[in-house]
Regions:
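Active-site region of the double-stranded beta-helix
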Residues: 127-130, 153-160, 171-180, 186-188
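Glycine-rich phosphate/pyrophosphate-binding beta-alpha loops
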Residues: 154-156, 164, 235-240
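Non-heme Fe(II)-dependent double-stranded beta-helix
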Residues: 2-31, 38-151, 157
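Non-heme Fe(II)/2-oxoglutarate
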Residues: 2-15, 59, 63, 87, ...
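Double-stranded beta-helix
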Residues: 3, 10, 15, 27, ...
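Short, surface-exposed loop/helix-turn segments at secondary-structure junctions
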Residues: 77-82, 151-152, 200-212, 263-269
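Short, solvent-exposed loop/turn segments at secondary-structure junctions
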Residues: 41-43, 137-139, 156, 174-176, ...
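Short, conserved beta-strand element in jelly-roll/cupin
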Residues: 158-176, 219-222, 227, 252-256
Length: 311
């Protein structure tokens, strides 16, 4: 069987107790390549941002008015008129117009600066954490035209420091059936793997042929998060709940002393910071990286060269 579609054999285990023992937390993070935390954020914090994102969708007539607002059901007749190109633009599951409005939300970007989240990564890194400003929202509209995110390593797209970690935070309850995130446990140990082309988000699929790692997954509740190393292979699961929209955030963090690639300081999408910042009240969220002294590493396109997938 192709390892990319092999069923999961591992279940997520709550790493919250490890926060009291930093050395154990670091050992477990290195061994598994990821850590899962139950109820890391309060449900109220998640639902507040979920509401703001759903308001954007409602303004664009993308919610089903006959269903409860917070349930996040899509306006299926309108979604069905969208092209494959619109739905798969930039791998975020919705149109550029919708995404632009989400990127303008101050509270969306503020999530990466949550004191509890920065404290977690300070503990993991053993030094001050730098939160990347290039925050990503996934607004996965329900459509058969939407490509599922293939197995991949984030380092292919981020580069800079390999000790960059992603926090995947669902904006609401996201069970496996709604298209949650699956992690290939221990795959951070395998180094940078070869890739082939794939139509899903990022355009690249990591080739897993001959590797013996096992998939871990589970149902996420609002407030749960999973964090994982840039070399850890992960993938999206298909949305099998008709009509439901899946909302999640990708937030990235690294030790402040480590090098970075310049694109990590740009907006996610063809936007400009000055325009996104219009109407913001928190000056501390604007251009905060300019006070840092980074070593910049050039983007290496050669690691993205594609091979044939032969399993």
């Amino acid at each position: 069987m192709d390892p990319a579609i092999k069923p999961a054999t591992r279940a997520f285990e709550d790493a919250t107790p490890l926060l009291a023992t930093p050395e154990e937390l670091r050992r477990e993070a290195a061994r598994k390549g990821y850590l899962f935390f139950k109820h890391f954020f309060t449900r109220e914090e998640i639902m507040e941002l979920r509401t703001q994102i759903l308001n954007v969708l409602q303004d664009e007539n993308l919610l089903d008015p006959a269903k409860p607002f917070l349930d996040g059901f899509g306006n299926q007749p309108l979604i069905d008129t969208m092209t494959m190109e619109e739905l798969n633009w930039n791998g975020i599951g919705t149109t550029q117009q919708v995404y632009h409005k989400v990127q303008k939300l101050q509270d969306f970007h503020a999530f990466a600066h949550h004191p509890k989240l920065l404290g977690l990564f300070d503990t993991l890194f053993g030094e001050r954490t730098f939160p990347h400003p290039r925050n990503i929202a996934r607004i996965m509209l329900p459509s058969d035209k939407l490509n599922v995110t293939p197995p991949h390593q984030d380092f292919l797209h981020i580069q800079g420091s390999s000790n960059t970690w992603t926090c995947w935070a669902p904006m609401g309850d996201v069970p496996v059936s709604l298209g949650s995130l699956s992690i290939l446990e221990g795959s951070n140990d395998g180094g940078l793997l070869q890739v082939t082309s794939n139509p899903g988000a990022g355009g690249l699929e990591t080739i897993l042929c001959g590797l013996g790692y096992e998939w871990a997954e589970g149902d996420y509740e609002a407030g749960d998060i999973v964090i994982f190393h840039s070399m850890t292979v992960h993938k999206g699961l298909p949305n099998r709940q008709p009509g439901r929209i899946r909302l999640s955030l990708d937030l990235r963090f690294q030790p402040v002393s480590q090098p970075i690639e310049n694109a990590s300081l740009l907006p996610h999408g063809p936007f400009e910071w000055d325009e996104l910042y219009e109407g913001w009240t928190r000056e501390d969220l604007k251009y905060y990286w300019k006070k840092e002294q980074f070593e910049f590493l050039p983007f290496d396109e050669s690691i993205r060269w594609q091979k044939d997938k032969i399993c």
